[in-house]
Amino acid sequence: MEYNFYLEQKYLYGGRVEARILTAARAEALGYEDDYRRNTANYRLYVDGFNSVEAIHSYLSDLVNCTLVE
């Protein structure tokens, strides 16, 4: 995998965002890679790679109506 961590972001059609931090191993197991995108009936899914958890938290601080799910 290209990055150490990945951020799974579900942009719900109601206007909220649910985000989950994944290790590279977990992202790979889910079939994700950097810039992965998919549309479903309930949300748009985006996956972006990051080198650190701190970088993910910095990115998340700019998102509106975002909930970090563990």
Segments (PLM) and residue ranges:
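Short aromatic-glycine-(Arg/Gly/Cys) micro-motifs in beta-strand/loop hairpins
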Residues: 2-44
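Low-complexity intrinsically disordered segments
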Residues: 47-70
